[in-house]
Amino acid sequence: MAEVTNCAAIVLAAGAGTRMKSSTQKTLHEIGGRSLLGHALHAAAGLNPEHLVVVVGHQRDQVSPAVDAISEELDCAVSQAVQEEQNGTGHAVQCGLSALPEFDGTVIVTNGDVPLLRPETLRQLHEAHTGEANAVTVLSMTLEDPTGYGRVLRADDGSVTAIVEQKDASEEQRKVREVNSGVFAFDGAVLRDALTKLNSDNAQGELYITDVLEIAREAGHRVGAHVAADPEELSGVNDRVQLAAAGRLLNRRMVEEAMRGGTTIVDPDTTWIGVNVTIGQDVVIHPNTQLWGATTIADGAEVGPDTTLTNIQVGAGASVVRTHGFDSVIGSNAQIGPFTYIRPGVIVGEEGKLGGFVEAKKTQIGRGTKVPHLTYIGDATVGDYSNIGASSVFVNYDGVNKHHTTIGSHVRTGSDTMFIAPVTVGDGAYSGAGTVIKDDVPPGALAVSGGKQRNIEGWVQKKRPGTPAAEAAGKAQDAKANDQTTN
């Protein structure tokens, strides 16, 4: 495909989107971990345009900062033009063109609520537009059921004679299955001139961009249409139902891309993959798994089932089962889960383990270190090849401030150990079960706490008479006495 040159793009994002019934501006709703407007701008930026303009209007206090953030993400300058009063698509393009006062090349106009459009399709539109020497080129699509869409009518030479809306179409015209998508390529000079001739003499009292086609034809210019290969790319989003439908279509695209890249996805219907996720080869993803943000899954890892990872780096060969994790790193060949909660700032070393019902936060765990089960570990550093016993708690919060715990390498702690931070446990140290560690433990030492166990005989029967426990104790004592008598 030829390189795109002398091109600008205008993305329309000024509408109110009332059918979304939301305090969030329509184009800022997300699918695949990216806003609708973000998807549209990524597609337009794929043209490498000389100028990229977003027309903002309704709730621009929300949209403008979002545009700035997307511009930074794309590393691409994005201008903003304001449509103070939403007076139709033609008026919106007038506002966008005001940001391009000296530009007369090809102007691509697309919409901020069409998230599935690929850059390749826009490049094909540009190529058809310039290759056919059109003044206007409509990006059209062929639908099995075109009801509700404006029909694209063509002359014998293939040029477009008109776009007729459903309500204005004759019975014969309604049989046409090629329809307008609302995406166009314009000759900049022709567009600039035609916009001055638009009028609002219509039922809505608005300026329509589709009227530019008739104005261009009357001026003797050629109007053409390029049929998109996949109509699903041009699915617009106007309400929550369409938002969900577009999300499913995008996710199917992401899942199929992953499988073609060498990933086994056991159940594509219950697997969700965001657009910024990277997955290696020979990865296995089990059902009910969601991967979001900048999550990366290295070769040979296994994720799921019932797992949600957001901004997580998973190393090669690691296993992550029934885990919710955020903003953390899991080393190669590490084992995570089941029922593990990884909060931001966790680094699990190679061959490390966070087991069942473990919650970790802002913690670095060394190579081969295991936290097997029923443990909270937060604000801690643990060295290599240590083992934290079951039901241990890193007591990091004093009610005002968080404090750090440092555990050395080759440490073995007994079950139900409490680490009262700030505290340090040296290399090779041990702790007994039930130990409360309030002071530093030297390397190689055994830490124990609590006095000798004391049993108060008969306490239950004296203090809790008549209870099932007292009755059970009495029976046991009687049985013991009978055994002694018999013997």
From Swiss-Prot:
Annotated segments matching region Pyrophosphorylase: 1-240
Gene: glmU
Protein name, entry field: Bifunctional protein GlmU
Protein purpose: Catalyzes the last two sequential reactions in the de novo biosynthetic pathway for UDP-N-acetylglucosamine (UDP-GlcNAc). The C-terminal domain catalyzes the transfer of acetyl group from acetyl coenzyme A to glucosamine-1-phosphate (GlcN-1-P) to produce N-acetylglucosamine-1-phosphate (GlcNAc-1-P), which is converted into UDP-GlcNAc by the transfer of uridine 5-monophosphate (from uridine 5-triphosphate), a reaction catalyzed by the N-terminal domain.
Catalytic reaction equation(s): alpha-D-glucosamine 1-phosphate + acetyl-CoA = N-acetyl-alpha-D-glucosamine 1-phosphate + CoA + H(+); N-acetyl-alpha-D-glucosamine 1-phosphate + UTP + H(+) = UDP-N-acetyl-alpha-D-glucosamine + diphosphate
Domain of life, per lineage: Bacteria
Family: In the N-terminal section; belongs to the N-acetylglucosamine-1-phosphate uridyltransferase family. In the C-terminal section; belongs to the transferase hexapeptide repeat family.
Cellular component GO terms held in the UniProt record: cytoplasm; membrane
Claim: Membrane is one of the keywords in the record: no
UniProt-annotated binding residues for acetyl-CoA: A390, N396, Y397, S415, A433
Annotated organism of origin: Corynebacterium aurimucosum (strain ATCC 700975 / DSM 44827 / CIP 107346 / CN-1)
